[in-house]
Every structure is written in C-alpha cells, then in structure tokens.
Amino acid sequence: FLVEKCTELGVRKFLPIVSQNTQTKRISIERLKKHIIEAVEQCGGNFVPEIQTLNTFQNVLDNFPDNRKILFCDETLEYENIQNTLNQLDFGKVGIFIGPEGGFSLNERRMVEKNSEVVRISLGKRILRAETAAVSALTSWHSKSGDWTK
C-alpha cells in the first residue's frame, strides 16, 4: 500500500530501511517493484520510481545526498502545525523518513539530532500507521512545494 500511494503522489525514489524497531527484515524488493509498476500504470505516470535495496537507518542517514533536507516524521515531537514548519523552510528536493511500527528508537533520534540536514516534523497528535504517515507527509510537502514533476 505504501509504495503504491507514494508512487501515485510522485515519489521518485524509495529507500527502505531497517531500523531498530522494524518488525520484519524480510522485505521483498521485487514484490515492491511490482506494486510500483502497477501504481504507475494505474495513475498514468510517465516514470517508474527507483527502489533501492534494504539498508540500515545509520547507512541511509550517513549517505544521504548533501543537497537534500530530510523531513523526519517524529511522533514524539510536541505538536506543531506541519504547514507552519514547512513554510519556514526554503529548500527543493527532500527525503521523508517514516518510522516503523513502534517508531524510531532513542538511539536513532540521537543520530538525527546530530545531522544538520534534518528537519523534524510532527504529523499531529495521533500515532499513525506508516502508510498513513507517508501519505500525510507527502501531501503536506506537496502543498508546500507544488508539483514535484516541474
């Protein structure tokens, strides 16, 4: 569901990560690719998003492109309207980090706090499933940045 909806919303690349609270280590990249292609066909898209191999949280964070901010969806962050946060920022391409069931660990939060490219955002007072959080974050970003395909 997550890759389908995110593909429909214009995501260009998926970086599946294993964090300390990830429930399964057996994510089938091939199965996800099939879902991505189905979503592209369904919505009439003109590009197929890339999906990288499963990687660790630390490795993705350490190797994230320097020219992009990371929107870190943090359910422990005191609620602040996401649009207010996004409107204060001036940047182009972003990566959005969505946590697993159980959220990001304290250790992972500490890693994020040390990274100057990370912007912590709240998706509201509710604890959302990863799929819902992804759609919510992408929709909020899309309302700030306009159409990603420009």
Mark where each language-model region is.
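Beta-strand/loop-alpha-helix module characteristic of Rossmann-like adenine-cofactor folds
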Residues: 9, 74-76, 150
